[in-house]
Amino acid sequence: MTKRTKKVGVTGKYGVRYGASLRRDVRKIEVQQHSRYQCPFCGRLTVKRTAAGIWKCSGKGCSKTLAGGAWTVTTAAATSARSTIRRLREMVEV
């Protein structure tokens, strides 16, 4: 059986509705939210989205639940805040 949604991917379910640019944006978001991410605790590629902003590691012996972004585990704001906190800690230690 051939792949019928080569160009549109997961947004093939919308057909011709809603416009191409909106479907392109939705495709990017849906691919991010349905993919697996690396667990920061066990290092395995087993973190999946359970609800908006809630991520769970299904690794053997890990089963940690994380709070993150709605579509990805980490957001740009969280990464920025984490690096700022790390930099401030280094300044205090020195």
UniProtKB/Swiss-Prot annotation:
Any Gene Ontology biological process: cytoplasmic translation
Any one GO MF annotation of this record: structural constituent of ribosome
InterPro entries (alphabetical): Ribosomal_eL37/eL43, Ribosomal_eL43, Ribosomal_protein_eL43, Ribosomal_zn-bd
Gene Ontology cellular-component terms listed: cytosol; cytosolic large ribosomal subunit
Pfam families: Ribosomal_L37ae
Annotated localization: Cytoplasm
Keywords, in A-Z order: Cytoplasm, Metal-binding, Ribonucleoprotein, Ribosomal protein, Zinc, Zinc-finger
Mapped zinc finger ranges (C4-type): 39-62
Main location: cytoplasm
NCBIfam families noted in UniProt: eL43_euk_arch, PRK03976.1
HAMAP family assigned: Ribosomal_eL43 (MF_00327)
Function: Component of the ribosome, a large ribonucleoprotein complex responsible for the synthesis of proteins in the cell. The small ribosomal subunit (SSU) binds messenger RNAs (mRNAs) and translates the encoded message by selecting cognate aminoacyl-transfer RNA (tRNA) molecules. The large subunit (LSU) contains the ribosomal catalytic site termed the peptidyl transferase center (PTC), which catalyzes the formation of peptide bonds, thereby polymerizing the amino acids delivered by tRNAs into a polypeptide chain.
PANTHER family from the UniProt entry: 60S RIBOSOMAL PROTEIN L37A, LARGE RIBOSOMAL SUBUNIT PROTEIN EL43
Subunit structure: Component of the large ribosomal subunit (LSU). Mature yeast ribosomes consist of a small (40S) and a large (60S) subunit. The 40S small subunit contains 1 molecule of ribosomal RNA (18S rRNA) and at least 33 different proteins. The large 60S subunit contains 3 rRNA molecules (25S, 5.8S and 5S rRNA) and at least 46 different proteins.
Miscellaneous field: There are 2 genes for eL43 in S.pombe.
Protein name: Large ribosomal subunit protein eL43B
Protein source organism: Schizosaccharomyces pombe (strain 972 / ATCC 24843)
Gene: rpl4302
